[in-house]
A protein has these predicted regions:
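Long, continuous compositionally biased terminal/linker segments
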Residues: 194-213
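An N-terminal domain-cap segment
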Residues: 1-20
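Extracellular structured ligand-interaction cores
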Residues: 21, 35-37, 70, 192
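Conserved beta-strand in the GNAT
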Residues: 25, 32-42
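Active-site beta-strand termini and strand-to-loop segments that position acidic
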Residues: 26-29, 197-198
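Short secondary-structure capping/junction motifs at helix and strand boundaries
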Residues: 3-7, 33-37, 105
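A short helix-loop-beta-strand connector motif used in the catalytic cores of GNAT acetyltransferases and
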Residues: 15-25, 48, 188-191
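Acyl-donor binding region in acyl/amide transferases
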Residues: 43-177, 182-190, 195
Length: 213
């Protein structure tokens, strides 16, 4: 994606939030290789580090009442050889268990769209995906957030027929909502959509699967 990382470990994605996060891992049963990851920043740890990664990309003022029971998800990654659905479902199951055990009910995060996505370049894909999801999956206005470095969607082609990345589609199927227009992340050269998922909004099919309710 053309990432330009400034980290203490060359070639590795490391930032100041890592040491404050819980890290969910899925390992291959045979090789024990890590094949799936999530990092989770709890409310208590967010206070310790001074905020969330999402705070660096968006003004989250309107989410202040949610923060006491809100975690931030990030760095979701599944090994290319295991992107058949099983690994991400295992991660989501572990995440649901983590939320319930810790009496948390809200998740936020930045869902990334590469500047080059499905052959569409220069942010037109991200602008088009934003125009799609704002019509069907936009959160109530009281939860809207503002990007600190907005993607200039008004100057991009926003009517291209392009599917969102698989992870974003998965979040939307679960019942997640988009909190506003995308920010541009120059370090990773992506457009980042702010997303929110509340357990109360979990689609009934997945509620039964993950929560047994």
């Amino acid at each position: 994606m053309g990432a330009r990382l400034t980290t203490p470990v060359p070639g590795h994605d490391v930032d100041l939030f890592d040491d404050y996060c819980e890290h969910l891992l899925v390992r291959d049963a045979q090789s024990l290789q890590v094949i799936g990851t999530y990092r989770v920043l709890t409310p208590a740890q967010a206070k310790r580090v001074g905020g969330t990664y999402s705070d660096t990309e968006f003004d989250l003022t309107r989410l202040r009442t949610l923060r006491p029971r809100m975690v931030e998800l990030g760095r979701s990654c599944v090994h290319p050889d295991h992107r058949h659905g099983g690994v991400i479902m295992a991660l989501w199951s572990a995440l649901a268990d983590f939320m319930v055990r810790n009496e948390l009910d809200t998740m936020i995060g930045c869902a990334s769209i590469p500047m080059l996505h499905n052959g569409v370049v220069s942010g037109d894909a991200a602008a088009s995906i934003w125009q799609q999801v704002r019509k069907t999956h936009l959160a109530p206005i009281e939860y809207h957030v503002l990007p600190r470095l907005p993607l200039p969607v008004e100057h991009l082609a926003g009517s291209i027929a392009v599917d969102p990345p698989a992870l974003i589609k998965g979040y939307l199927r679960l019942g997640a909502r988009v909190l506003g227009a995308p920010a541009w992340d120059p370090d990773f050269n992506t457009a980042d959509l702010p997303m929110l998922m509340r357990l109360v909004d979990l689609h009934p099919r997945y509620r039964k699967h993950f929560l047994g309710a």
